[in-house]
Amino acid sequence: MKFGSAVILAGGKSRRMGFDKQFLQVKNHYLLCHHGEQLAALFDKIIVVSNTPELYRETPFVVVSDEIRDKGPLGGIHIGLKTAVSDYVYFLACDMPNINLDYIRYMRQCLESSPARACITRFGDWIEPFNAFYSRDLVAAIEDYLGAGHHSLFRFLKSLATHYVSEQQARHFSPDWRMFLNLNTREDFEKWRRQGPGLGFHAPSCAASR
């Protein structure tokens, strides 16, 4: 299976938000669970990486915790890839609320026509490491990189044979760049909730308990 797995990363310090962002709620449901429902339209296996796995015991997701602790996003990518069953794995952060399924399909097409170890979007001189695909064969490379004492995700990505989607091409799918929005503060979340579309939740298991 080439594109069967998606990973939602629920870790991070959330300093600016003031609380753990995996607890973001809309209509008394965890936002992360809404992500899982949307991604299930394209992926057979939805994996949540969280160091509080008990939160998701009643959900349909596969829930895992970092195997290599305190290494930032690379630790989450590492365990997500190890748990996945497909050649390529889609990664999303839990604070990215605007999933664009058409863009995910487009990235899959890019990797079908031009295989690489990752498919990542450029934004000016920056890159967007999530809302991206990574090859499952990166597990050993991540272990070597972290074992050598390195932590920087961006330095690691520069070492890969990567298919980069240009900002211009990505804006065909999201002219305002909303599909890469991160909810970093309470103000970000409240603004998004006021402006965003109404969200419907269907899985009772996703009801927030706190």
Swiss-Prot record:
Any GO MF annotation of the entry: metal ion binding
Necessary cofactors: Mg(2+)
Cellular component per GO, a single term: cytoplasm
Species of origin: Syntrophotalea carbinolica (strain DSM 2380 / NBRC 103641 / GraBd1) (Pelobacter carbinolicus)
Family, similarity comment: Belongs to the MobA family.
Cellular localization per UniProt: Cytoplasm
Assembly: Monomer.
Lineage of source species: Bacteria, Pseudomonadati, Thermodesulfobacteriota, Desulfuromonadia, Desulfuromonadales
Coiled-coil regions listed: none
Single GO biological process annotation from the record: Mo-molybdopterin cofactor biosynthetic process
EC number(s) from the headed UniProt entry: 2.7.7.77
Keyword Isomerase belongs to the record: no
Protein name from the UniProt record: Molybdenum cofactor guanylyltransferase
Assigned keywords, A-Z: Cytoplasm, GTP-binding, Magnesium, Metal-binding, Molybdenum cofactor biosynthesis, Nucleotide-binding, Transferase
Binding site for GTP: L9, A10, G11, K21, D66, D95
UniProt: Mg(2+) binding residues: D95
